[in-house]
Amino acid sequence: MDIRYDCRQFKGTMPCQPHKVHGVECNLKCKYYVPTDGNILIIKLGAMGDVIRTTPLLIRMKKEFPNKRIYWLTDFPAVLPDLVDFPLTFSVEHLTYLRSLKFDMGINLDKESEACALLEQLDIKKKFGFGLHQGMPAPISESANHKFLTGISDTYSKANTHHYMKEIFDICDWEYNGEEYVLPSKKHNARIDSLDDSKPIIGLNTGCGVRWPSRQWPFGHWQEIANMLLTSGLHVLLLGGSE
């Protein structure tokens, strides 16, 4: 059997979707073959909101490199969309796997030392974002200087007029053209699906990332707004957990 290891749908540990749905075998005759020609790595561990805010990069990546496999290392793989071929976590198993690969492009948007060290260590042709200098987090590309300075200088940060999307696109040497967030595919929930869809459903995300506890809204405020929405005849849905 001529295995198409470079097919985007090839899993290696289980049958691919075309095999399950159409019964085709993985060989040179498969009409569902989707070729790939390289790999891209994104390192954006957290916080959850920042991971979601980084997803517009995927739109540009798919436009510039439609045949690349995209790997994303994060603490929140559940929020990654289907455009990511391999959602990975910062675990021994996944780090071991990453070290066996070669990447055409690697982007690290975190300044934590472990993320910076990993970008330095991996086999990546073109690196963007943050690495290490004398053992400390530092811009690994000139395009990351601006974002780096906003993190070490309050003066520079207060004078900064760039929004997050422009900053991360600048790091990759791309112009931000209004690319939007990309969310995971909808997953059906019987309790939510049973709600009266003639009324709007208002989601309240009551959690808060551990990095920014000052942004946590007081519990009483959540009660007040939930009661106000319910009184107005709207559905209220509490989202997430502690974060």
Regions picked out by a protein language model, each given a short descriptive name:
Residues 1-243:
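Catalytic machinery of carbohydrate-active enzymes
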